[in-house]
Amino acid sequence: MEFGLSWVFLVAILKGVQCEVQLVESGGGVVRPGGSLRLSCAASGFTFDDYGMSWVRQAPGKGLEWVSGINWNGGSTGYADSVKGRFTISRDNAKNSLYLQMNSLRAEDTALYHCAR
């Protein structure tokens, strides 16, 4: 019986830690076609440099689309064909932050952008 109680307690603790993960995006705005924006994502509640990170977006009335990804140390990146050559993903592990530099913006880039672990 003691073992069962300990196990339930451990699960409760782990679930509590998981709920504290936060990813807060900033830097969006309204720009003209051809303009630039830099998005930031501040991460907390987990060991940031243990994880690869991604940016995804959702255009009005459409589903989620993967935009770009980066491995734990920034040594490897990938991009959707639709943004290749225009967007640049980067990260600063010392600041627990993820970035997306978006250049040569087009009307079709209009979307809600989210960072994802």
UniProtKB/Swiss-Prot annotation:
Immunoglobulins are composed of two identical heavy chains and two identical light chains; disulfide-linked. Disulfide bonds join C41-C115. SUPFAM superfamilies: Immunoglobulin. Residues 20-117 form the Ig-like domain. Residues 45-52 are annotated as: Complementarity-determining-1. It is found in: Secreted; Cell membrane. The gene is IGHV3-20. One of its GO terms (cellular component) is immunoglobulin complex. InterPro entries: Ig-like_dom, Ig-like_dom_sf, Ig-like_fold, Ig_V-set, IgHV. Residues 78-115 are annotated as: Framework-3. Residues 53-69 are annotated as: Framework-2. Its main location: secreted. Residues 70-77 are annotated as: Complementarity-determining-2. Residues 1-19 form the signal peptide. SMART domains: IGv. One of its GO terms (biological process) is immunoglobulin mediated immune response. Residues 116-117 are annotated as: Complementarity-determining-3. It comes from the Eukaryota. This is Immunoglobulin heavy variable 3-20. Keywords: Adaptive immunity, Cell membrane, Disulfide bond, Immunity, Immunoglobulin, Immunoglobulin domain, Membrane, Secreted, Signal.
